[in-house]
Amino acid sequence: MPPDDRLTAVLPPVRDGDIAPPIDVVRAALEGSPPPKPPPPPPPGRGGGGPSGPGGPSGPGRQFRINWKWVRRGSAIAVAVMVLLPLITFGMAYMIVDVPEPGDIRTPQVSTILASDGSEIARIVPPEGNRVDVKIDQIPVHVRDAVMAAEDRDFYSNPGFSWTGFLRAIKNNLFGGGGLQGGSTITQQYVKNALVGDERSGIGGLIRKAKELVISTKMSGEWSKDAVLQAYLNIIYFGRGAYGISAASKAYFDKPVEQLDVAEGALLAALIQRPSTLDPAVDPEGAADRWNWVLDGMVDIGALSQADRDAQVFPPTVPPDYAFQQNQTTGPNGLIERQVTNELLDLFDINEQTLNTEGLQITTTIDPKAQEAAVDAVDKYLEGQDPDMRAAVVSIDPRTGGIKAYYGGSDANGFDFAQAGLPTGSSFKVFALVAALQQGIGLGYQIDSGPLEVNGIKIGNVEGEGCGTCSIAEALKRSLNTSYYRLMLKLENGPADVAEAAHDAGVAESFPGVEHTLSEDGKGGPPNNGVVLGQYQSRVLDMASAYATLAASGVYHKPHFVEKVVNSSGQVLFDASKEDNGEERIDKAVADNVTSAMQPIAGWSRGHNLAGGRPSAAKTGTVQLGDTGDNRDAWMVGYTPSLSTAVWVGTTEGVKPLVNKWGSPIYGSGLPSDIWKATMDGALEGTDVESFPKPTEIGGYAGVPQAPAAPPPSAGPPTDPGQPSVTVIQPTIEVAPGITIPIGPPTTVPVGPPPGAPGAPVGPGAPEVPVAPGAPGVPGAPPPP
């Protein structure tokens, strides 16, 4: 076919503007990059389908158009969210949050320790500060008005919060402004201090403020306004370590809150804003300005007339140091506070943190008269002595176990010697006598007082003192080591029986620092022979308690300080008078016979009979300082039917000789007996003179034999002839006209059998042999020469 010579039209290729060129797509795939997007096609011109010219929509003359309808809708939604979301959140929080009942919120507050007559001994001030809660009706109305004038003038009408204060908090925390600022109501301030804390800046501060707002609002609906105001006035800080209006009243004016006048109440209200810097002792002008502002506020709210306001005078305050000292327990009372606190923790099985929130009023068994007598006696007889000399005194009521006097030292924060473990010397012989009587050995049982030797160790009495073969009652009076060592060996279980009798009477089986008392191995094993001579450690408290058991005819009462405990709400938590802690530990006949044997000893010990011929039963004790021949400790323990008192005298470390101001050795019949007599006489002055019960028979003897008598066949070896009558001559020296003092031990002159007759006494009245604890072979015996 011949070629077609007709003209053909060449059409350009049709391209889809949304599809990239194939070559570009392949190249992009090979290079691992996204394919390029083609440029958008030009929009059509205004006039139709041709290319747009300069005046088309793509040119610079195009305007961006705002859809105001959607803007209005979005703004409305945002405002709704900003308003509704906080309200919804507030409502949910209001429903969820639990507001405690009035009185359920525990805040640290002071507990007061009182003597038996209601006088104050000490105050237990918690670390968080000094606070004593009071009821709203104890706070004068004008004081309440002053606080409202200073802090919340529409307190009784507002809903518990301030919107202006809350909005200011939002502004300051979101945009700066120095942290949260004033405007809080009294309710909000209370919630902040008691429940939500005091974070003051940033988002945390804003959250805290929101919590405060919710709780304050709900609290205002559930608590009465008086309950809120009472709680607030008991928790707010006033400076000088005083939390609450009651403590502040004492800290600034040294008076109870009930006695505050208008001017004083206005000053305390003025301090709330800046308690430390507005203290009149720090900034008197600033305090006066704020005080005047509060008084003017009282006029504004109608709580004070202008005439009364004009009559007010700025009140004087006590020095800040005085307020601090009021919260510090000093002298021996500090050690009483320590023991009362420990007893409370044990009594209620609580910790100190819990104790510090109770605001307790603790009435103790301490008798102010007995306490004063003990302190005065120690001060009198230790005056002028070695500065290292120390003393301890404990007096206990045998009928209850109540501690009537307690002296462990003069330093409130120092070492308490009444709680120290100390060797007791011959005062422990009493428990050997208890054990002997329990085994049927009567007071008339005769025993040799001559020297003896055990395992190569010689045991003797001071200056060769002895009574030949005499009764165990006479040997106790003379404090003969040799006689009681032999008596202990005669017991069924020897030293173990002595220890058991001591524990039964009230010597503690353990105390802080000593896991097992009266134990040679310290692990509860048996004691050795030195126990009869007081080798092992006991406390002054324990000795007073054990002797009190004898005074009570064998009935033990646990020694205690706490008589009654009342909390800040007036609820009685404990009343010792309703507790029955008496327990018969020792047979009555045994205890009464021991008392009979001890009755002559106070007079025998250098004339320490009690005033007015009051009967007493007592025993001295002296402990030797190692193998030096000097003394280390000296004791006097004794009682009447109504009071048992133990006295110890020694030195701070127990490593130096115990001598008086004249350089003479101190024995139990010396300074300790002086202190004991002065304490007992002072404590018992004005009380009835009581007699001890008449003992019943044990081993053929009812009490101390009054005439020679042969012991029953089972009681032991035959007796020596009876003891002759003696006249006691006490050497004295006149130190001033008409005033004499004794010097040295008394001398006796026999008026019965001639000197040297069997059983005649030798040197009675001499002090007992000091006991050397830990001597080799026979603990408690003097070392070999």
Curated annotation (Swiss-Prot):
It catalyses: [GlcNAc-(1->4)-Mur2Ac(oyl-L-Ala-gamma-D-Glu-L-Lys-D-Ala-D-Ala)](n)-di-trans,octa-cis-undecaprenyl diphosphate + beta-D-GlcNAc-(1->4)-Mur2Ac(oyl-L-Ala-gamma-D-Glu-L-Lys-D-Ala-D-Ala)-di-trans,octa-cis-undecaprenyl diphosphate = [GlcNAc-(1->4)-Mur2Ac(oyl-L-Ala-gamma-D-Glu-L-Lys-D-Ala-D-Ala)](n+1)-di-trans,octa-cis-undecaprenyl diphosphate + di-trans,octa-cis-undecaprenyl diphosphate + H(+); Preferential cleavage: (Ac)2-L-Lys-D-Ala-|-D-Ala. Also transpeptidation of peptidyl-alanyl moieties that are N-acyl substituents of D-alanine. Disruption phenotype: Probably essential. In a depletion mutant growth rate is dramatically impaired, cells are short with bulbous poles and/or rounded internal regions. It comes from the Bacteria. Its EC number is 2.4.99.28, 3.4.16.4. It is a single-pass membrane protein. Its main location: membrane. It holds the Pfam family Transpeptidase. Residues 33-45, 708-721, 743-758 have a biased composition (Pro residues). Residues 46-59 have a biased composition (Gly residues). It is found in: Cell membrane. GO terms for biological process: peptidoglycan biosynthetic process; proteolysis. The active site is at E151, S426. GO terms for cellular component: outer membrane-bounded periplasmic space; plasma membrane. Cell wall formation. Synthesis of cross-linked peptidoglycan from the lipid intermediates. The enzyme has a penicillin-insensitive transglycosylase N-terminal domain (formation of linear glycan strands) and a penicillin-sensitive transpeptidase C-terminal domain (cross-linking of the peptide subunits). This is Penicillin-binding protein 1A. It comes from Mycolicibacterium smegmatis (strain ATCC 700084 / mc(2)155). The lineage of its organism: Bacteria, Bacillati, Actinomycetota, Actinomycetes, Mycobacteriales.
